[in-house]
Amino acid sequence: MDHIRNFSIIAHIDHGKSTLADRLIQFTGISDERTFKDQMLDNMDIERERGITIKSQAITLPYQAKDGKTYSLNLIDTPGHVDFSYEVSRALASCEGVLLLIDAAQGVQAQTVANLYLAMEHNLEIIPVINKIDLPSADVERVIEQIDDELGLDSEGHLKCSAKAGIGIQDILEAIVKRVPPPRGNPEAPLAALIFDAHYDPFRGTIIHCRIMEGTVKSGDTIRFMSNSATYRVEEVGHFLLQREKRNCLSAGEVGYIIAGVKTVSDVRTGDTITLDDRPCSQPLPGFREVKPVVFASIYPIASDDYDDLKAALEKYQLNDASFIYQKDSSAALGQGFRCGFLGLLHLEVVQERLEREYDQSIILSVPSVRYRFTLKDGSVVYVDNPAHYPGSSSIELSEEPYIRATLMLPERYLGAVMKLCMEKRGVNSTLNYPSPGRVELLYEMPLAEVIYDFYDRFKSVTQGYGSFDYELIDYRESQLVLLDILVNGERVDALSQIVHRDRARARGLQACERLKEEIPRQMFKIAIQGAIGGEIISRTTITPFRKDVIAKCYGGDISRKRKLLEKQKKGKKRMKMIGQVSIPQSAFLSVLKSDAD
Amino acid sequence: MQVHHNFFISMQKPKSQSSKPVGKRRAEDNPGLYLHIPFCEIKCRYCDFFSVTELSRITDFLDAICREMNLRGKVFKFFDTLYIGGGTPSVLRPDQLNRLLEHLHQHFTISKEAEITLEANPADISVSVMKELHSLGINRLNIGVQSFDNRILEFLGRRHNGRQAIQAIEASLQAGFGNFGIDLIYGIPGQKRNTWIKTLEQALTFQIPHLSCYQLTVEPETPLGQSYKKGLILTPDNDELFELFMDTSEFLEKAGYCHYEVSNFARGDSRISRHNSKYWHHIPYLGLGPSAHSFDGEKRWMNVRSLEDYIQRLNQGKLPMEFCENLTREELQLEALFLGFRTSAGIDLDDFEEKFGWNLWSVKERDYELLLDAGHLKIVNGRLQPTRTGMALADSLALL
């Protein structure tokens, strides 16, 4: 156990986390140049493109240190977005130390701080690493000052590197060995293993990623998930190298995988504790939380013939994403589809993109919604996450919506703008803290619905990217809610309906009309777009028809070219949804949630 | 390269096998022949047709195109329209044209009633030359007038002026060309609606049998396109162009022209361009010369867009083909629709069903009904026809 180090790299986006991970992997020699693919830990295309890590990943690096001993360094990569902050906390709970990576040119940024706080919560050894020191714009001295002043860390122990150029990599590895404490735990104790992720393998079923805190697990053992007492027989355990490498057992302090015939990823809960069925530990590891979706939207195939394909794609997708849930749904305007639950808007966008890219689905997403609670006049209580199921204002006794506590960290100079934004988003009960000079922590209680409605984008924009944001659900509170419908040429499009606060209704109606006007291409007919509450029209716009599209000349040599152009247009049209005679592009459905950027 | 042996068969097959009376087969269903003369004295700023200004290459080109006739003539026989376009075919001397036509007649059968059109630049037209051309069998002229306004002609980079345009029309009439057409361009940056209508009025004074009125298309690969890209010119917006289109159509129809295709107007049905109509009615055509396209009912192919390649390949006894595509039923269908909606004749619903095996009207009835109500379409004698506003929307109509 003395030869094990469990660590994570935390950083603001684009400060070089994935590049450093790659370099560490390369340095320890488990991957040669030939098999090396940049940013090995970001497996999904989307992760690589967006530069964010969505799923946690782990890899064991064998490293022969200068003291002559060989260590197993377990690098646990973490997701980088507030939607996944729970997953991050579970990954950090599996570590004893972190590399806090800071861009030498950009210095300390919002996520640097937010991640630092997360790491401190888990009492981790923090090693500040200044990256990109070879950049012409690098200002190492300034970053060192920031480490002292803004982060409140001792800059003495900082390291310098350029992950891209491969400078300073060995020093980092040495520091991990010397400074990150070896894991503690008793291999003879009853098993307690923390699940920090799981993924699906088509041949082996679910692969559970875990950190063994206490005890030992080996193949043949019967394990029990403490959250639901489900038991499974262990088929295989091992370490993550470039591929999975089978081991006889995993013992306290180690990071690795367990394969135990678990059919789907959704049977595994991140943060859950695994123990042995015949010799359980006395209590589960702390911090477990049932992850519940907070944002809901319906997914429909663009062509109704593709319903079965979409169904199959969702089934497959869910194997790998336990936090995604769905059930059958149908819409008058869009036909058969599925109502889905997501951790947040980013999660929703990721699911949408992956369904399109990896599963080749052409889909429409309805306007996202939170889950409202209505007490009806007959005394019954209903939860509604789909505006189509809005009970009707005359039967409602009490309307409630979910509230969150938002924690916002930002440089003091943005305080005014952020408070204004929070008030606009119906934030209440604010608390203001000064954790370090120049930096404020702002706590607000606000409706979750306001947060999914473009809060994050606007917060980032008013703080110029220096703000970090986290939230937790607190409770349901009474609210004045109404159903806002959108009519396209007089036809109600249920997938565009939203449940909104009464005071916001008119503004939202206007905004929805304006957004749709931008998103829906002009067509041969005039298109009227209206926002309505009950029977009352509260907003209206018109998309004027285009009147000419024909080219002047079309002779023998022009026909093939013209045909190809039209075929392209036709393809584009196929990706739109027909509502009556109006073609509505996919983007329109999400656009109604976006407001004007200030 | 045996690619087009079925030129004739393919176009006759569906007709002869159908249960329709043979009488419905129209004379204009015969293929048309196109010759591309890729020479211009100067290049106009807006034009992206293939041509070169090295007039010294004319002799070699004539040798080459005659070789192409030898190769194609073995398979293709009968045509009832011939269109000599370019480029500027009128840069050829009458004796050169004569050589071309003689060689053509040796290898192809051109109907005695064939429409034989030559494109001509007003600057090349004189009574004597036109008389000579007439005697060679050319019976229709298409004159690239574009405008009578010198400022516009200069903007377009034409080598003639307004006076020459008028003289060319008069000379053509004098030389005995009862059938001829002129090209005009509108929607030019800075051109006022009134200026354009004045141009039309001027054209009307000559009772010109055929008018092609083209909205200026800014092609990216032209000097004009470059100016546009740099922001040096401002083109009218879509709504303005629509208004101009409508004004043109109304004005000319009032003056007795039929607006039979998006950009084409004829003084009576007998004056329509029979050759160009073949393109819009999806009738086969054979194109000779560099960059010329051909269509046999199933395939379309294109000759190389380079004079030197063209000459070289034919010197080696090879066909100068650059690309050839086999059209799928779906592609043919789309073509039939977007071409059909360009013409006032529209689409014959029975013909369409016979050709493609499904009934256009019953499948798209909901859309079409709305368009009938909106006044973009009409049904006349089993034909689905665009109205004036419908013609402007031909592309969208085809995509429904």
UniProtKB/Swiss-Prot annotation, chain A:
GO annotation (BP), single: positive regulation of translation
UniProt key word GTP-binding: yes
Cellular localization per UniProt: Cell inner membrane
Recorded superkingdom: Bacteria
Reactions accelerated catalytically: GTP + H2O = GDP + phosphate + H(+)
Keywords on record: Cell inner membrane, Cell membrane, GTP-binding, Hydrolase, Membrane, Nucleotide-binding, Protein biosynthesis
TM ranges: none
CDD domains: EF4_II, EF4_III, LepA, lepA_C
Gene Ontology terms: cellular component: plasma membrane
Membrane topology (UniProt): Peripheral membrane protein
SUPFAM superfamilies per record: EF-G C-terminal domain-like (SSF54980), P-loop containing nucleoside triphosphate hydrolases (SSF52540)
Molecular function GO labels: GTP binding; GTPase activity; ribosome binding; translation elongation factor activity
Binding site for GTP: 14-19, 131-134
EC number in record: 3.6.5.n1
Residue ranges constituting the tr-type G domain according to the UniProt record: 2-184
Listed InterPro entries: EF-4 (IPR006297), EFG_II (IPR041095), EFG_III/V (IPR035647), EFG_V-like (IPR000640), EFTu-like_2 (IPR004161), G_TR_CS (IPR031157), LepA_C_sf (IPR038363), LepA_CTD (IPR013842)
Family label: Belongs to the TRAFAC class translation factor GTPase superfamily. Classic translation factor GTPase family. LepA subfamily.
HAMAP family the UniProt entry points to: LepA
Function field: Required for accurate and efficient protein synthesis under certain stress conditions. May act as a fidelity factor of the translation reaction, by catalyzing a one-codon backward translocation of tRNAs on improperly translocated ribosomes. Back-translocation proceeds from a post-translocation (POST) complex to a pre-translocation (PRE) complex, thus giving elongation factor G a second chance to translocate the tRNAs correctly. Binds to ribosomes in a GTP-dependent manner.
Protein name per its UniProtKB record: Elongation factor 4
